[in-house]
């Protein structure tokens, strides 16, 4: 699914630059609410819908050098925004897939940028229990539901990895921006699913929730409230009902 953002080409409607600002702010190792320790950080505005939790250690400045850990989905989000050299200019010395063999680097902090799936959360908890990195800053591409967050917190505590986590943030950037005002939700095989006579109601609910979450990320990144018009009985109206939840 690839969609363009309408309207005149202006800074306020430049989706790619807005998403880039959110991602570079994430890489600055600064809190979404400001760096309480007074260390350096990006001046780019954070996503107005984002939320975060900081578990800052006492004293010390943020280390500008870091490791970036992503999954295949979030790699597709970052790739159109930042080249390898640009990542290095933001202090990223190494970027690795979450589900790959990774050696411990205990003297360097890590920025995790992944989807909040059960598989990803279990992998992060294992990393924290092994203390692979100095501190871990967790950034999720979309909202992590409260029950999932509570289960993740219990898992981290039970495995002894809580001290490894520096902060947790919802970023709401669940889309890949290909051009200034062109994006894709990277929904695999969506046409097949929607036209599959064997698809269950649960399958359709999950797909619609995913699309609604991606569209919410777009408007959250732009910092605007959309005006959407559609017929009273239509698939778009069904999608908007998911979007409003």
Language model: regions and residue ranges:
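Extended, well-folded catalytic/binding cores that form a central cleft or groove in large enzyme
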Residues: 1-245
């Amino acid at each position: 699914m690839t969609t363009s953002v309408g309207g005149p080409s202006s800074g306020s409607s430049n989706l790619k630059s807005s998403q880039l600002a959110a991602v570079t702010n994430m890489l600055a190792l600064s809190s979404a609410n400001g760096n309480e320790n007074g260390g350096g950080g990006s001046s780019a505005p954070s996503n107005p819908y984002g939320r975060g939790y900081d578990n800052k250690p006492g004293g010390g400045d943020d280390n500008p050098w870091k490791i970036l850990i992503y999954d295949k989905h979030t790699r597709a989000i970052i790739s159109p925004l930042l080249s390898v050299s640009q990542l290095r200019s933001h202090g990223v010395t190494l970027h690795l897939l979450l589900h790959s063999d990774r050696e411990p680097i205990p003297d360097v902090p890590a920025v995790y940028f992944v989807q909040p799936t059960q598989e990803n959360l279990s992998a992060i908890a294992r990393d924290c229990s092994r203390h692979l990195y100095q501190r871990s800053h967790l950034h999720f591409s979309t909202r992590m539901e409260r029950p999932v967050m509570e289960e993740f917190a219990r898992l981290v505590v039970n495995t002894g990895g809580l001290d490894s986590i520096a902060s947790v943030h919802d970023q709401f950037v669940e889309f890949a921006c290909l051009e200034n005002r062109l994006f894709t939700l990277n929904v695999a095989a969506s046409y097949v699913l929607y036209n599959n006579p064997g698809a269950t109601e649960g399958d359709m609910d999950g797909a619609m929730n995913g699309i609604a979450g991606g569209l919410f990320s777009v408007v959250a990144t732009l910092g605007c409230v959309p005006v959407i018009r559609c017929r009273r009985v239509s698939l778009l109206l069904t999608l908007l009902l998911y979007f409003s939840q």
